[in-house]
Amino acid sequence: MMLPNIQCKKNMLKYVNCGIVFQEIPDEVTLSINISNCPCHCPGCHSSYLWEDTGEVLDEKEISRFVGEYGSNISCICLMGGDAAPQEVNGLAAFIRKAYPAMKVGWYSGRTILSSQIDLENFNYVKVGPYIKHLGSLKEKTTNQKLYKVLDDKSLEDITSRFWKK
């Protein structure tokens, strides 16, 4: 008996929009890429339009197009979301690190812990934590969210307080 040739379709990242921002990663001019199909569905989310599986494919070719368009104006690329496909997020981060070694890479995850499919070697910054309205965003001292800088030894330095007004 011959079995049918079944190919598994990998999760494909899609993005809805992107833009240059100055507040997502301290001391960086960041191209923030908003990834759709967010599984977190945080109550009070300011980006609920990212819950649906919509947008354009986000792959190595699209990252290269972004770098060609914005490269001299940015120092960091931050993938905003992608919790439904952390392996693909990790793959894009690895690509950015290899193809554009001077470019910093960040990831904003809505999960409380990093996926085991994430290799910190591929990131300079990672944010973890769902948005919980009564605790506030990163700029609030009461937030549950944390932004970490990945150090050379792959340990994490909590830099969340950099968002707080003195």
Predicted regions and their residues:
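Short, basic/glycine-rich phosphate-binding loops at helix/coil junctions
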Residues: C42-L50, G71-S75
